[in-house]
């Protein structure tokens, strides 16, 4: 996928759901995977010509896995002139050594979001961008129907009153195959997950 096509899909979502307002400071949550890195490029490109001026920062919550090297992402953010924060945590130690969780995904997500939101507030951001694409939204809806008997999926924009942050999902119109194509074309520096249960649990 070309950058121009990615920007078109991103702007469509941003405009339709009024995701960005003048003066916003948006934190881009970076996991190291293809989705979040593609979104970083998309918002960086959008920032250059979008009529409403906004600031971008990037952040990764380091869960504490050994050999989780974030230097390629640091280099990318430096190249794009985007401030980048690595928020260290003991989440891995707590989940796998203290609590010895056999299915840690739900608790991990809650702890990670807690650490992320606190750090984002410290950074002075008022919004956080998540890289959920169209396939994620459809998959979440199907899993909700199968396991909970109801239709539920991510909202394009959600205000979190407890933290006074707004979550936006500017990649909601982008297909995963296009994300893969963009990652390959632009050789994004994907950092592989070190989680021992990655790929072995349902969403």
Q: What are these model-derived regions, one by one?
A:
Residues 188-203:
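The feature marks non-catalytic terminal segments
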């Amino acid at each position: 996928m070309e950058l121009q096509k990615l920007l078109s899909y991103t702007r469509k979502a941003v405009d339709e759901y009024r995701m960005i307002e003048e003066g916003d400071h948006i934190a881009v949550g970076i996991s190291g995977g293809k989705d979040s890195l593609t979104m970083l490029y998309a918002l960086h490109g959008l920032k250059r010509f979008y009529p409403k001026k906004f600031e971008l920062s990037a952040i990764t919550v380091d869960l504490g896995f050994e050999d989780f090297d974030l230097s390629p992402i640091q280099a990318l953010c430096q190249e794009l002139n985007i401030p980048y924060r690595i928020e260290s945590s003991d989440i891995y130690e707590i989940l796998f050594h203290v609590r010895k969780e056999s299915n840690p995904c739900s608790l991990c997500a809650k702890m990670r979001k807690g650490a992320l939101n606190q750090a984002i507030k410290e950074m002075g951001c008022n919004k956080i961008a998540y890289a959920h694409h169209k396939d994620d939204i459809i998959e979440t809806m199907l899993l909700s129907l199968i396991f909970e008997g109801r239709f539920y999926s991510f909202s394009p924009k959600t205000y979190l009153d407890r933290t006074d942050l707004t979550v936006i999902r500017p990649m909601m119109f982008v297909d995963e195959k296009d994300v893969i194509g963009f990652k390959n074309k632009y050789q994004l520096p994907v950092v592989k997950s070190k989680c021992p249960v990655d790929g072995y649990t349902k969403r």
